Each structure stands twice: as structure tokens, then as C-alpha cells.
Curated annotation (Swiss-Prot):
Protein's recorded name: AAF/I fimbrial subunit
Organism: Escherichia coli
Location of the protein in the cell: Fimbrium
GO CC terms, sorted: pilus
One BP annotation, GO: adhesion of symbiont to host cell surface via host glycoprotein
Key word Plastid present: no
Keywords linked to the UniProt accession: Fimbrium, Plasmid, Signal
Chief location bin: other
Amino acid sequence: MKTLKNMRRKNLCITLGLVSLLSRGANAALERPPIKATETIRLTVTNDCPVTIATNSPPNVGVSSTTPIIFNATVTTTEQCAKSGARVWLWGTGAANKWVLEHTTNTKQKYTLNPSIDGNSYFQTPGTNAAIYKNVTTRDRVLKASVKVDPKIQVLIPGEYRMILHAGINF
């Protein structure tokens, strides 16, 4: 019995030694060799983020109206673009990017207006530039701005008026 027990121990030792030897050889083969060549992979990501402007204003106003008229604009983008750290912009066509309400046939009849903005938006240069921007987040992807026309001050004549606004997005 003693010899059988010793043989088992010897076989176990031989087996363990062989496994140990093989595993050291396998690990040696898995070591990273020195650098012999280098290649750089390049990826260009383009700004394909959509941006939309939604506006609302009263459809009709009488000449005799003295009630202030509010024009609202909302700029939004997608959630993925917000995750990427996008910044949405809104600006008008007037001097210093102000909003211009202009009569479509009587071009002398126009008013340059300073927009009001929501609390999380900013003017590009407060007091001198009416371009508005907002760093959007997944929770808040909307820039809101508005202008008020006071018919007591900005007298409106019959006809159609227009206001052109632009929106953009960058990072």
C-alpha cells in the first residue's frame, strides 16, 4: 500500500510540475512584444444635429388694438445632440441680431425689438448683441425667447408684417 501511495504522490508531483512548466511557457508567449509598427485610425464626426424653431403669434390684430402683442420662439434639438453638449442659438435679422418686425409692403414701417429670454439662456454679449444661446441638456433641450410689441408705442398700420429668425447649433 505504501508504494501505491508513494506512486500517487510522485504522479501528482510530476503532473503538477508539468502543468507549472506548461503554464509558464504559455504565459511567456502572451507577453506583449516591443512596438515594431504604429498606425493611427482617424474618425471625423460632423455636426448633423437638427435644430428647429417653432413660433407663435396672434393671427390677426386690429389697428385700433392697444393690447401688447407677444411673439414667441422656441428652439429645440434632439436628445442625442444634447448629450453631446450642444449649444443652440437664436437670432434676428436686425442690427446686433435683434428681432425686426417689418411690414411686407411698406418697408419704412418696421420696428427693431430686443428679445426677452428664459432663465437658462444667455445673450452672446449682453446689451450689445441680441444673439441668444443655451447649453442644452437632456433634461432641458429648449431655448425660449419672446418679443413684445406695444401698439401704443410701435404703431401698426393695416397689412401683413413679418419677422425672420434664424437658429443654429454648435458645440
